[in-house]
A protein has these predicted regions:
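Interdomain helical linkers/hinges and coiled-coil/dimerization scaffolds
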Residues: 103-165
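Active-site residues of response regulator receiver
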Residues: 7, 54
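Acidic catalytic/metal-coordinating carboxylates
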Residues: 35, 61-64, 82
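Short amphipathic alpha-helix used as the core "switch/output" element in two-component signaling
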Residues: 41, 63-73
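Acidic, metal-coordinating helix/loop segments flanking the phosphotransfer/catalytic sites
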Residues: 32-50
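Receiver (REC) domain active-site loop signature in two-component systems and cognate sites
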Residues: 57
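Two-component/phosphorelay signaling modules centered on CheY-like receiver
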Residues: 10-31
């Protein structure tokens, strides 16, 4: 799984990098960006599964970043990190479909707990998608088999029918 943190304060990103054991969580790649534009550049070159970002940043804020990123990457799980416990932000995050909302400063174990839940959600979604694809493949295979049997039923040679089964 690939995760990205976006915050305009480098010290916050450094603290997260030092305080969270990403390897223990099963996270393969962790990227950091200090602004929305850099985050979008990274997402265009590296698939990101989970995006955690600050709300208030210069230029494009975290809410705008999430809105834009979700349009391009609808499977992206988004989590807001903010030092503002503003109810309006919480409402907007719900409307945007954010997975969670973490008020900073948050202990690392709280962030890790949210990441664990988000990772579990990713794994479950991937399993559902794989099952769906297998089901589609099986359905297509069954239809192809039925088509071959039906075509061979109309042939005059009965060995053709037996060979299609």
């Amino acid at each position: 799984m690939n995760v990205m943190f976006v915050d305009d304060q480098a010290s916050v990103l450094e603290g997260i990098a030092a305080g969270i054991s990403f390897q223990d969580l099963g996270i393969d790649v962790v990227r950091y960006a200090t602004g929305a534009e850099r985050a979008m550049e990274i997402m265009s070159s590296v698939p990101i599964d989970i995006l955690l970002c600050d709300i208030e940043m210069p230029g494009e804020d975290g809410l705008q970043l999430i809105s834009r990123a979700q349009k391009l990457y609808p499977e992206l799980i988004t989590i807001l990190l903010t030092s503002h416990a503003d109810f309006e932000y919480a409402q907007i995050s719900v409307r945007l479909g954010c997975f969670d909302y973490i008020v900073q400063p948050a202990p690392y174990d709280v962030i890790e707990g949210v990441l664990r839940r988000a990772l579990q959600h990713c794994y479950e979604r991937r399993k559902r998608n794989q099952l769906y694809e297998v089901g589609k493949w099986m359905q297509t295979g069954e239809m192809e088999l039925l088509d071959r049997v039906a075509m061979n039923l109309f042939s005059s040679d009965t060995s053709d029918v037996q060979s299609s089964m």
